[in-house]
Amino acid sequence: MRILKFSILLFYSTFLAKAQSNLKLTDYYNNPSSYNPAYVGVTEGLFIKGYYTSQWTDFEGSPSSQMIDLQNNFDNRNIAAGISILNDTFGILENLNVDTNFSLNFKSSQDISFSLGLKAGINSFSTDYQSLNILDRSELIFNENISKIIPVIGVGFYTHGKNWFLGISSPNIIENKISTESDEVLFKNTNQYFSTFGYNFYLDNFLFKNQFLAQIIEGIPISYIFSTKVIFKNYVSLSLHYQPQYLTGGEIGVYLPGNLKISYGMDISNTVGISKYDNNHRFSISFQIFKGKSNWSDRQEFDKPYIVR
């Protein structure tokens, strides 16, 4: 029973961590709209991206995430909107997040723009203890499957010039909690904040994109990650990233005709005592349609370095 209790505690510890920040920082910096709704006003036309990440791939029920992100910048209206759907699974735990993002876009000068964003959605948490092979179900927690829906309201600010960008956001400002029928608190939401800054420069046919992303959660040490991406024209990209004390990783992306981009990335844990099974793999595919143009263009990330694809 002590081993069983420890296993359940481990599951819940991971669940709470994922509930507090659905994705890893590497996944966040690849998907800015997941933490900053103001970003949806940056892209042009219609943008669609699919994203998949998995961890501990040799274990049944290992953590995995699937996300679909859609953004549309309406012509000549300074308004953009989008929707993102994120599904997290880890063994008996499932977290479904559905967000709508809205932004108002302004130009303060010819080269500098900024956006104000609002995020609204729901987060659904559920567990299925019946799928566990538990011999002794006498403890109440084993008899209570959890199914809760909590609201999500977030805000964000994003500004950029030709070769730099800066963003500040909070993806959920509502404090809420998840409890069992016996009033045991399993999860209490604490506001989290994100800050990002990037500076980019060209060297012949290469674009170097450098980004810093920090995540601040009350009562938890600040998490931050550094990344550098090199894009050769708009044919191929290679990026490296480092999160101190936690992970090192990289990603390669290929730009295809028809404004398609396919990427594969991997993270390797730097934590002492963590095995190779903690490696994280991710795949993504995206495409973009530019309105008012007869031909699609796959050059936006190279020509506009504040864009993340």
PLM regions and their residue ranges:
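Sec-dependent signal peptide recognition
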Residues: 2-9
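Sec/Tat signal peptide C-region and signal peptidase I cleavage site
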Residues: 15-19
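Subset of outer-membrane beta-barrel
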Residues: 20-309
